[in-house]
């Protein structure tokens, strides 16, 4: 296994290769036979299952129902919403024939399901009593990407997409923000990602949306990653798909809709935020294995102690390695998998009723404890471990957050650093396109937690009160 660990390129030499090495060497995923696709291996898929579990529980608290809609969308249906089709047309995969028979109408493989859901809702909704409809589906989607990387940007990926219809503008907008709060809490408390919440600019908002809200995270290398979005459509989609309901005054009125989603790119965010040159470093709540027990020898006494420890730590996901692999191999395997807590049990320690325990982020800091006290020790170590991961990520973000007031200052920062740059920005699409042309960066969000300050746009010098985060992004 040490030989396997040597395959991981150091982070400070080539971050991109380091990331790829982590994905492949930790057996999270493999490349698929079609360019841009990937195979989820068991360990990687278990992380996704835990993401699903946590989010599904939160969704159900706000009355979300799970459904499943078809993979294929008729072209005529998709074409109803011009902004939507324009936003996705370069990425859409199309089915044109079955066997040798040409289809009468092209079928799009879903890049997202707004149009399918809206078409369905138009037939289901008649009265205000039918509302709200709050649906979510866990599924795959396809967007034919030019440049792909496992988890971060693949032509086919897994995600959840929620779609809702409401009887009032305010109710829809509030629900959209409620979902964003769920994403923020999940990112911070489960994934230990110190995300920033905000609204997308006009240029970066979702095609067809009135407003797009986002959680943005900064990776270890200083590039941004969009971790989740919630879109408020107002009545943009419901007018196109003629979704009307009879209100309490018995008048017909267009409904209001939202959509929201996170994807398997969250796994990419975990890797690039927390991991190191020795492999994965996983937050405890999302780690498939939280505690790894390594038996140095297989004896009856050690087997008995292992069972006692497993019973005491029954609240945790535990794996016992009692294989005939070498001790060094077992240690390295636990390390590369990013398992938060490692317990080593050998005959010498047991003479004093002791075991050796360590944290993944502090490999050399091993302590010996009485195995009878293992529950309280692990409880505290897990808390300290998770807090350290979050604080390290937050410190990295603080150290890589800058301010600029002019395009010249902005370009100078980019020459020396990667990170979030807060700038006064006018918000115009044309201005942002000019910035992207000049710098290959774009806006990440208009943060919620900002005071209104009059200033000049850092690029075009027009008056503005907006402070916007710009960065290079995955």
Swiss-Prot record:
UniProt keyword list: Aminoacyl-tRNA synthetase, ATP-binding, Cytoplasm, Ligase, Nucleotide-binding, Protein biosynthesis
Transmembrane segments: none
One GO MF term attached to the UniProt entry: ATP binding
One GO CC term on file: cytoplasm
Superkingdom classification of source: Bacteria
Gene Ontology BP term (one): prolyl-tRNA aminoacylation
InterPro entries with a match to the protein in the record: aa-tRNA-synt_IIb, aa-tRNA-synth_II, aa-tRNA-synth_II/BPL/LPL, Anticodon-bd, Anticodon-bd_dom_sf, Pro-tRNA-ligase_IIa, Pro-tRNA-ligase_IIa_arc-type, Pro-tRNA_ligase_II_C
Record localization: Cytoplasm
EC number(s) per entry: 6.1.1.15
Keyword NADP: no
Pfam family, one: tRNA-synt_2b
Keyword Nucleotide-binding among record annotations: yes
Catalyzed reactions per annotation: tRNA(Pro) + L-proline + ATP = L-prolyl-tRNA(Pro) + AMP + diphosphate
CDD domains xref list: ProRS_core_arch_euk
Assembly and binders: Homodimer.
Sequence similarity: Belongs to the class-II aminoacyl-tRNA synthetase family. ProS type 3 subfamily.
Domain remarks in the Swiss-Prot or TrEMBL record: Consists of three domains: the N-terminal catalytic domain, the anticodon-binding domain and the C-terminal extension.
Protein name: Proline--tRNA ligase
Origin species: Mycoplasma capricolum subsp. capricolum (strain California kid / ATCC 27343 / NCTC 10154)
């Amino acid at each position: 296994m040490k030989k396997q660990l040597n395959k991981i390129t150091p982070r400070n030499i080539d971050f991109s290769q380091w990331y790829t090495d982590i994905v492949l060497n930790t057996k999270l995923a493999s490349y698929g036979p079609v360019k841009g696709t990937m195979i989820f291996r068991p360990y990687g898929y278990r992380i996704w299952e835990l993401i699903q579990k946590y989010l599904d529980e939160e969704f159900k608290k706000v009355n979300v129902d799970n459904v499943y809609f078809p993979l294929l969308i008729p072209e005529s249906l998709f074409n109803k919403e011009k902004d939507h089709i324009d936003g996705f047309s370069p990425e859409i995969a199309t089915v044109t024939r079955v066997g040798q028979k040409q289809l009468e109408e092209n079928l799009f493989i879903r890049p997202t399901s707004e149009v399918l859901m809206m078409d369905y809702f138009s037939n289901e909704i008649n009265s205000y009593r039918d509302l709200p409809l709050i649906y979510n589906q866990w599924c795959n989607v396809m967007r034919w990407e030019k440049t792909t990387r496992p988890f971060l940007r693949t032509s086919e990926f897994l995600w959840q997409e929620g779609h809702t219809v409401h009887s009032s503008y305010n109710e829809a907008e509030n629900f959209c923000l409620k979902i964003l709060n769920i994403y923020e809490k999940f990112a911070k408390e489960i994934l230990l990602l110190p995300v920033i919440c905000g609204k997308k600019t006009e240029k970066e908002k979702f095609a067809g949306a009135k407003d797009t809200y986002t959680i943005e995270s900064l990776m270890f290398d200083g590039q941004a990653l969009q971790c989740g979005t919630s879109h408020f459509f107002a009545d943009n989609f419901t007018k196109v798909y003629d979704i009307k309901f009879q209100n309490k005054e018995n008048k017909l009125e267009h409904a209001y809709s939202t959509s929201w989603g996170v994807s398997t790119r969250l796994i990419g965010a975990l890797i690039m935020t927390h991991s190191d040159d020795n492999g994965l470093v996983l937050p405890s709540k999302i780690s498939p294995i939280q505690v790894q027990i390594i038996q140095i020898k297989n004896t009856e006494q050690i087997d008995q102690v292992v069972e006692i420890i497993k019973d005491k730590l029954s609240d945790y996901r535990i794996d016992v390695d009692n294989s005939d692999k070498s001790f060094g191999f077992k240690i390295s395997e636990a390390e590369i998998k990013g398992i938060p807590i490692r317990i080593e049990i050998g005959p010498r320690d047991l003479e004093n009723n002791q075991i050796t325990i360590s944290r993944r982020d502090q490999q050399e800091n091993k302590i010996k404890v009485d195995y009878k006290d293992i529950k309280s020790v692990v409880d505290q170590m897990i808390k300290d471990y998770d807090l350290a991961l979050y604080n390290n990520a937050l410190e990295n973000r603080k150290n890589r957050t800058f301010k600029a007031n002019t395009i010249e200052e902005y370009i100078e920062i980019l020459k020396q650093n990667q990170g979030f740059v807060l700038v006064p920005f006018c918000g115009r699409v044309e201005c942002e396109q000019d910035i992207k042309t000049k710098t290959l960066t774009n806006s990440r969000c208009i943060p919620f937690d900002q005071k209104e300050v009059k200033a000049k746009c850092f690029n075009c010098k027009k008056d503005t009160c907006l402070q916007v985060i710009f960065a290079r992004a995955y």
